[in-house]
């Protein structure tokens, strides 16, 4: 049972509680990600059938998707090719390794362990249909569909990703050497770097988790945006792989399928109830937002939203 109503006051309490934690730092291996206010802490919730509530301790600005963008090729390819084909390209098993692990791919390849790892997302980007501009138009189409609006690519982050992305290049070449890359290495990586470099405001991040919470339907119009089957598979992957080798801890504490990114965004879903996004760029060594997890755990406890509760 919920112990509190969902109110702005509750969200404010969650933000202030999270602010007390001074651990973590902004990701600096992509230089542009370090140029943000590390004290920014925010949360937004879209309860199904109710108005959106949001609270931030600082003025908001667009933040790049980073690994939350891995949802885009996963969902788009599931919708267009189906699960059987997708599972020919990538597995859906928790890895227990960090998000950019090369040894995992070497030992257990040629299929990446799951679509939430860098190797998995790169493999899926290589399967985006078309060539060159056609693939970017495919990406634009699915961004529009999953965010209900167009998003812009941050050119500085995109350039920074390309300049510092040698580990991702290594993963792509390893996939290519194992015959599990469906396109040219450089073209595939351009798609992957673009995927990570889309930027969105806090409220723009809410549409996708709300659709997933609502069995694939637009929470306002009721239009079927995604199939129920795609929602089911996507939520299962988020629940088991969404926060890399910290997913188990996350699920024990929050009971919410989620997907994190090193920019500080985490989207979370309470099936049948709400879509959630939290933002704080202070991330831990595993690439997950520390304050974001504090807010999600507090929200789950306050609202009784842990999946294991009757």
Swiss-Prot record:
It catalyses: L-glutamine + H2O = L-glutamate + NH4(+). It comes from the Bacteria. The keyword Hydrolase applies. Substrate binds at residues 67, 118, 161, 168, 192, 244, 262. Belongs to the glutaminase family. It holds the Pfam family Glutaminase. The gene is glsA. GO terms for biological process: glutamate biosynthetic process; glutamine catabolic process. This is Glutaminase. It is an enzyme of class 3 (hydrolase). GO terms for molecular function: glutaminase activity. Transmembrane segments: none annotated. It comes from Legionella pneumophila (strain Corby). The keyword Hydrolase applies. Keywords: Hydrolase.
